[in-house]
Amino acid sequence: MVVKVEKKDKNIVELEIEVEAAKFEEAVQKSYLKNSKKFTVPGFRKGKAPRSIIERYYGKEVFYEDAINIVCADAYDKAIEENDIFPVDRPTISIKKIGEGENLVFTASVTVKPEVELGEYKGVEVEKVEVNVTDEDVEKELKAVAEKNARIMSVEDRGIQKGDIVDIDFEGFIDGEPFEGGKASGYVLEVGSGTFIDGFEDQLIGGRPGDDIEVNVTFPEDYGKKELAGKPALFKVIVNDVKVKELPAIDDEFAKDVSEFDTLEEYKESIRKKLTEAAEHRAKHELEDKVVAKVVENAQVDIPDVMIERQIDSMVRDYNMRLNYQGLDLDKYLMIMGIDYQTFRNQLRDRAHDDIKRQLVLEKVAKVEDIKVSDEEINEEAEKIAKSYNMEHEDFKKHLRDDDIEYIKATILFKKAVDFLVQNAKIL
């Protein structure tokens, strides 16, 4: 097999691959054995006609399509491996020369992982991240715990107030006509949370269970759904239920109820310790992010669009999974946020670009500094993951696919590259 590699613009590589005639003949024979039953030839039962007869009757090229697929796939995989080419998309195949007894010649044009030009990456200067947990931080955490332990009580003797939790049915109309995505039943809303369009929640104040309320709002000019942007709308709302949070008193009894401590002061001290540990953890990661951000900013790389689109695909899938855990799906979320799918994807584009650039730069640093990941490190990380899933290590390993192992390896490599950059940075 002969391979010629030519680098084109925009991270495109074109390979011209020449495969020996004998290899192509083997593939044609395989194609005949696979497809012979599909052809009808007078004088022969279906699938019993010799290859030469079928070719004479239907033409020499009758078995070429599958043969080309077989040969090109194998030759392409071998060519990119031997030439250290790292595709990020499927190749476009073009046949240049084909025929009986002749070498098969084809080109494969493919987008490849871009080259990274590192700028300054050792000795970058960043400011130290200070850790400071205040009394206000402790009080805020106490209030959050109190919120979680609040009793939710139905309210019947007064109207809706800010902070109340209401259960409502609603349907929206524009010019007297209902619109798509404007209707829901049993929707639970905290009044004053700003979940809905400006003005919607305020007009619920004073309502009681069983009330029918007409809410008039205007969709923002920059609303995601263009057909609704800037238009006035009427929502017919039925109040099903009104509840209020009753917060517990924050005292020694509260501390006993929610913790292992007997006094509020002891509980506060434990909160301060927990917040300090969390703040130190955040500070460490913030420092790492600052260092990496400087190194990434100093680097140059031209990222192909296909890599960005695939990163966005991955981000959308992850986002949808998180929404599913909350009992939502992406369509419902987009309706609530008032944006369409393409707008949502566009909002992710810059982050996708930055994530890919960060990954590529860290890979380059690891390569330049000869940072490696050992089998032992992969094994240790797999064991940690297994424990997080309450699985035995050996059972977990049995379920690992090659791409799972590569993901674990990449995660360790990036962490080691980040550690290297932080160790070699100037912390001011």
Swiss-Prot record:
Domain PPIase FKBP-type: 163-248
Biological role: Involved in protein export. Acts as a chaperone by maintaining the newly synthesized protein in an open conformation. Functions as a peptidyl-prolyl cis-trans isomerase.
Entries under PROSITE patterns matching the protein: FKBP_PPIASE
Entry remark concerning the domains of this protein: Consists of 3 domains; the N-terminus binds the ribosome, the middle domain has PPIase activity, while the C-terminus has intrinsic chaperone activity on its own.
InterPro entries: PPIase_dom_sf, PPIase_FKBP_dom, Trig_fac, Trigger_fac_C, Trigger_fac_C_sf, Trigger_fac_ribosome-bd_bac, Trigger_fac_ribosome-bd_sf, Trigger_fact/SurA_dom_sf
Subcellular location: Cytoplasm
A molecular function GO annotation: peptidyl-prolyl cis-trans isomerase activity
Ranges that cross the membrane: none
Keyword DNA-binding attributed: no
UniProt-listed NCBIfam families: tig
GO biological process assignments: 'de novo' cotranslational protein folding; cell division; chaperone-mediated protein folding; protein transport; protein unfolding
EC number per UniProt: 5.2.1.8
Record protein name field: Trigger factor
Gene (UniProt): tig
Recorded catalytic activity of this chain's protein: [protein]-peptidylproline (omega=180) = [protein]-peptidylproline (omega=0)
Family indicated by similarity: Belongs to the FKBP-type PPIase family. Tig subfamily.
Keywords: Cell cycle, Cell division, Chaperone, Cytoplasm, Isomerase, Rotamase
A GO term from the CC aspect: cytoplasm
